[in-house]
Structures are given as structure tokens and as C-alpha cells.
Amino acid sequence: MSCILGCNSNTKNTYLLNDILHDSKEPIIKKVLSDLNSHEVQILLTRINRDSLGVPKFERHTFQVNSEHYFYPASTVKFPVAILALQKIRKLQSQGIPIKADTPFKILYSENVIKRTDSTHPKNNLTIAHLIKKIFLVSDNMAYNYLFDFIGRDDANKAIHNIGITNFNLSHKFSDSDSDLENKNRTPRFIFFNQKGDTIYNQAPITSNQKIKNTHLDGVLKGKGYVKDGTTIDESMDFSEKNYASIAALNQILERIIFPKVFSRNEQFNIEPEDYFFLRYWMSRTPNEVTIPFYDRETFFDSYCKFFIYGDKKGEMTNNTRIYNKVGLAYGTTTDLAYVKDRNGIEFFLTATILTNKNEIFNDNKYEYEQLGIPFLAALGREIYQFEKNKN
């Protein structure tokens, strides 16, 4: 058991998380603890202690956290991509380009327009700001794909590494209907235009030259088989060319958005105060609280993208507790990274992942998300919240 060093942190080598887990009366936690090896659980808790001036100091505690052991981050990587899209907008503004996050744009492959409108936008516009909202509300894959291309893969990785975050590499987009038009190492063209329809920024296709391979990590070969084109292949699935984001890296990104001033200037994202407010607002909303964009309340319930505390419940979230987070769910891996804060001053960061793939076959869509993955993270969130509440 170890604590991860970080900026303005008070590190303690304790068994806090181990004790919380083993003292838990939650059946789902006991079940996972009985088979830790197959579930590849990693948990990072950051307790927040404020001084007399209200300045936060971080006290980190870990359970099985290992940045050298690979887990598939799934949609959690949409969070840094949302941040970097806003950062790129600010960079373009600094170059004199009259562009904003709500400037409409269109996307072209080989000069053919493949995307220009968004039916969930009140004006039917495709904008960076609206795509970010969709990422946090319902984890929209296409929204991530468009932002990924807008930034460029190599530039995205460089931007994260430049602020001191390691053990992080983006390599791919998610499944989308434009895949037949896509060159994986070359983005489409982006054209931003004003209300008159005049072009204000024309971004040529970006070519990515980095070769992403996670072969140095443990656990990149997973399971005993995987499904490809409807056929089961009897060998481990290779994740070495998939996206990679360690528990520590995800947590560090979130800390920089919630408490940017805790970090030195060269460790912060290069965005403006209103960008921080925008990100915090939308990452803490639920589909039920929002009318634009509107999502069906039955399909996209309040805890649809909130796994900690409420993931195994529907219709029970209240304004008393805000969860600023991004979840990931794919290849049997369930992950959440969150800053939790309630009206009584209880606050903490919690990042955790669990693998639930009983048959050890990947890509067969037979995973225990609802039975085990999400309920475990929900129970874990409740245990940590209750622990912090008792301490207060």
C-alpha cells in the first residue's frame, strides 16, 4: 500500500483503503475482495484537508494502484479531450482568430462534407461547446471523435505530457459511422464559420506520426479469447495499441480542473476561468437536470453517467451532493473518476476501476456491468462518503 506523490500533497503510507474495504458490510464489496486477481481493482482516494485560509492540501491513499498495469480507460479519456478542445480554442484566439467554443463548424473528408449539423443543438449547429456537453451528459462517442480530430492525436498527447502528467497516451477514436471514410492517422478538415456563413478558420487535415504501443505495460494481453467479425479467436486480446490512462493520470487531470491554483502555472491547462466554470458545471450535471440538449429521461436517467454512490440506483440523486466526474465502460472495464462535494463541506477525489469479464472472452458483450461493476463502484462511493462524513 502506498501513496502517490503530488503537488501540495501530504502523503501517508497507510492501509486506510484496505481497512475501509475489509470493514465494509456491503455484500458486493465482499464479493469483489474474494476474487481480487480476476477483477484487477485499482482505487485512488484523495482526501482534502483545508488550512485556515481554505487552501486545499491533498492526502492520497491507494489500493492496488499500479501505473504499470494496464486497464482499458474507455470513455474516461473523453474528459481530457474536452479540456484540450477548449485549450485549442484559446490558442487560436491568441493567434488573432475570431473563434469561440460556440462557433459553428463543418467537417469534410476529401472535400466532401460529412457533418455540419447537430439535431440536439437549439440552432442545429455543430459546436465545440455543445459536443462537450454531450460528452459529460451521456458520454457521446461521436462528440469525442470530432474533438479528437479537432485537436489531433499527437498534439493531444503532447499537451498532457507538457503539464507533467505521464502514463497517458491517446491512440484511437471510438466506433463511429464515418469509419469507412477515416484514415486513422489523418484527420478530416474542419471549417469554422460566422453567422453569415463566412469562413473564419480552415483547419487542414492533421497527420499523426506517433506510434502508440503499450507493450512495456503488464496486463496488455487480457483474457483467453476475443470475438472478431463474429468469430471467437482463442488467444488473449491485445490492448497494446489501445488508449492508455493510468489511475494516477486521470486523477491528476481532474485535480487540475477542480483546483487549478494548487498547481504551478506550467502544470495547469492553458484555459480561462470561464472554461473551468463551464467544465465543472457540465461534468456535474445529470441528463434529468438539462433540457438542452434533451435526452429521454427513461433511457438516460439521473445516474446514467454517475457510478459512485448512485450508480446502482435510479431517481435518487439530489442537489445535496454534487459529483464532478467522467465514467468509462467498455471491454468489461468499469471506471469512474470523480470529485465529490456536498453542502456540508464533505469533499474528496475518488478514482477507481474494476474488470468484470467472467468468461474471459472480450468483445462478446457478455460482461457483468450491471451485476457487479457498477454496483461495486456505487458501494465503494458510499463507503468513502460515509467514512468522510464520520470523520467530519
Q: Across the structure, where does each feature detected by a protein language model lie?
A:
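Short, Lys/Arg-enriched charge-dense amphipathic segments
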Residues: H61-Y72, D118-I132, I165-S179, R189-Q203, ...
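Short low-complexity stretches enriched in small and charged residues
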Residues: E59-T62, A101-T103, I114, A204-K211, ...
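C-terminal motif of bacterial Sec signal peptides marking the signal peptidase cleavage site
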Residues: C3-G6
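Active-site-adjacent loops and short helices of periplasmic peptidoglycan-processing enzymes
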Residues: T11-R186
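Residue-level detector of conserved, well-ordered beta-strand and adjacent loop positions
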Residues: N8, K106, T351
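Mid-domain, small-residue-enriched loop/turn segments at the edges of structured enzyme/sensor domains
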Residues: T127, I132, V138-E272
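Structured C-terminal helix/loop/strand segments within mature extracytoplasmic catalytic/sensor domains
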Residues: K12-I28, D35, D229-N392
